[in-house]
Amino acid sequence: MAREDASVPRSHDSADASPNSTAKEIPVPQPPLLNLNLNLNMNSGFNLSNWWHQITSIEADSSDDRNNNNSNNGINAAESDSAQSQPIVVLGHSYQTTEEAHEDIIKKLCLTYRYGFERIPRAVNGPSPLSFMQSVIFSKSLLYNLQNFNNFIEKENFTTDVGWGCMIRTSQSLLANTFVRLLDKQSDIIALFNDTYLAPFSLHNFIRVASSSPLKVKPGEWFGPNAASLSIKRLCDGYYDNSTSETILPRINVLISESTDLYDSQIAQLLEPSTETKGLLVLLPVRLGIDSINSYYFSSLLHLLSLEQSVGIAGGKPSSSFYFFGYQDNSLIYMDPHSAQIFSSDIDMSTYYATRYQRVDIGKLDPSMLIGVFIRDLTSYENFKKSCLDAANKIVHFHATERSTVPESRRKNSEFVNINRSDLKDEDYINIDRVNRLDSTDDFIDLGDDYVETNTNLEEATPSAEDTVPVSTLSASESEITTSSYETPTSKDDNSSRASLDVVVLDTTGEQQE
């Protein structure tokens, strides 16, 4: 599967990014604007407060106009009567009216940008906090907090994630709403995400574990789905395995499947009833297209959101991430983390619920995203599997047993390997233990995995030297081997049912195959 490489710095998310969407407003009181002098007298010197108010008052006014135009539309403002008649689906629950859906949505946890949190030191050769000054300045939330402006920007420390932290925030939202299924008291859950190093699932600790991972993401660099999923797994594992932590949450396991393949035997092991495990969070960091989601996956993505096991999707637009938790017709409903709020060690729960939720047409989404599925037990898994199979879901694929002993994170599929007879054991793969047998071969060969022996009829003896064909030594006259990565089918008529396919083409003519 072709995926985004989270180790490559991405352009940073804007402070008020939003796809073409409508919004439903929940009235919240705003503090009064500071009483600033609007007359900028250049003879008396430049006044930052005056300049700031002039450039933001226009933006704030236009934003208010947009909000007023959209506030009455809400999530049910579909473009046609047929769309309006469609139910509203929110993480497995279906509602016939906007009011019913609204009551559910406002209970979802939403983590957003914060200002003034505990310092995160700038990494050597990492982005400078000053490079995000424009994003900070043009964030409307700062309009009400100019008195603290000097505390928001430092040269060597990050005290805000405005401009770069939205993927972390949406991943936190996904994880927090997973925990809601395990713990009733939401204030206890939010305490685990507070922006300090002491909180196990804070932005600070997301960065800490990602910076030490193979991805080596630095503070100020944009997270991708891969970095986000790896951070979630490492933080969850550390939370439960660290004996000094107060584990108020029941234990859950985390499984990352970049290939979107799920193996019954592996799931059963992770949900072993004899253990203290109370569930399994499955994370699927995927890329479902090139510039936008391929229409081939539309129905499958909506189907996943309709299941009771769904805990949402983090992703959305290029260089901006949103938390998607439902849909109506072909419009996905999401929360926007780009509205920054002031950090406080005393948690204000009202700042952790969405004050607005929006929608966007599925065809306008960025194809790179992180899909979350929470499975409570084996019965829940069987129900999830049956639903996906019945719906012919094209994103998730199920298998009885694991076919490889190599951890998925180590499968690079980027080097030549020796192919032995013991590597090829069923009818899906051809035997190429002799070069001269390639003369009539034009099939695809999967070189990505070291397969576990499953066919008891194969010879048990260790293959001899003549049975081993070092692929890297084959000459062009004998066989040309090329590798290709097919990200997605180019048409919904394509018969492929996989999100992506890594293949090796063996051409006996000596010509490279496209």
Curated annotation (Swiss-Prot):
Name listed for the protein in its UniProt record: Probable cysteine protease ATG4
Low complexity bias: start-end ranges: 472-489
Major site of localization recorded for this protein: cytoplasm
Annotated family: Belongs to the peptidase C54 family.
Organism, scientific name: Scheffersomyces stipitis (strain ATCC 58785 / CBS 6054 / NBRC 10063 / NRRL Y-11545) (Yeast)
Reaction catalyzed: [protein]-C-terminal L-amino acid-glycyl-phosphatidylethanolamide + H2O = [protein]-C-terminal L-amino acid-glycine + a 1,2-diacyl-sn-glycero-3-phosphoethanolamine
Superkingdom of the source species: Eukaryota
EC number: 3.4.22.-
Biased composition (Basic and acidic residues): 1-15
Localization, UniProt: Cytoplasm; Nucleus; Preautophagosomal structure
Gene Ontology MF annotations: cysteine-type endopeptidase activity; protein-phosphatidylethanolamide deconjugating activity
Catalytic EC class: hydrolase
